[in-house]
Design a protein with these regions (language model features):
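Conserved S-adenosyl-L-methionine
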Residues: 65-207
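Long recognition/docking surfaces used for binding and targeting
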Residues: 1-53
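Generic secondary-structure boundary/loop-capping signal
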Residues: 33, 60-61, 200
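Preference for short coil/turn "hinge" residues that link or interrupt alpha-helices
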Residues: 29-32, 56-57, 72, 196
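Short capping loops/turns at secondary-structure boundaries
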Residues: 17-20, 40, 62-66, 88-92
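Class I SAM-dependent transferase core
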Residues: 43-68, 74-76
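Short acidic-aromatic active-site loops that bind/stabilize oxyanions
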Residues: 37, 59-63, 172-173
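Short hydrophobic/aromatic-rich motifs at helix boundaries and adjacent loops
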Residues: 19, 41-46, 57, 69, ...
Length: 207
């Protein structure tokens, strides 16, 4: 994990997990019945936020904005795809995550509408009159189009719509290095967008 996120400076080389063997075994026994690899980013993110709330709440006078308040403000702001979103005092990244998810949902809805439109075009009455071989060819072409659309939702594809949202539109800073790292990890757990989060006092007068 340290090597994978080395460029993001999430962990120091000296960081170690300090846990007793008995505690580790108890955690494994409790969690081994769940397949987290098949769990959605939303579920992982909610679980991580629950952990954050219990661990950091009130630490150094910092409190987290309730998710209902975040959702309300994001809905009022109504961020659009391609717009730059910045939180100069991002804390655990709640507002950045809310904005990321809001725009991501719009992208997903748009792509789903595009899929329906394309499928309707390919599955018209004309399709029913094709020979079996011609239908197979049409199905193959349809699958290629859908596969290309799916790359738009890959956050690692920097040229895709979700990739551009993750790498070009989401930015945040926090004066507390621990909170900056926490915001990065929180965004990773919610499906990414962490690359624009940095340790910096965003409220300083740089002029």
């Amino acid at each position: 994990t340290k090597d994978y996120y080395k460029d993001d400076e999430l962990f120091d080389d000296s960081d170690k997990i300090k846990i007793k063997q008995a505690s580790f075994e108890a955690i494994v026994e409790e969690l081994e019945k769940y397949n987290l690899s098949d769990t959605s980013d939303d579920v992982k993110g909610i679980a991580f936020e629950e952990f954050l709330g219990r661990t950091f709440r009130g630490d150094l006078g910092q409190f987290f904005t309730p998710r209902t308040v975040v959702d309300f403000i994001i809905k009022v702001l109504d961020p659009q795809e391609g717009e730059t979103i910045c939180d100069p005092a991002c804390g655990s990244g709640g507002f950045l995550i809310g904005a990321f998810e809001y725009v991501r949902n719009k992208i997903e809805e748009d792509l789903q509408a595009e899929r329906v439109k394309i499928r309707k075009k390919y599955k018209s009455e004309y399709y029913e009159n094709l020979s079996k071989k011609e239908q197979e060819k049409a199905d193959e072409e349809l699958n290629k189009i859908f596969s290309k659309l799916n790359t738009e939702l890959d956050s690692k594809n920097k040229n895709g719509r979700l990739g551009k949202l993750s790498f070009d539109c989401i930015f945040g800073t926090d004066a507390n290095p621990r909170m900056a790292r926490t915001a990065k990890m929180n965004m990773i757990m919610h499906g990414d967008g962490h690359g624009g989060v940095h340790h910096h006092d965003g409220l300083l007068n740089v002029n």
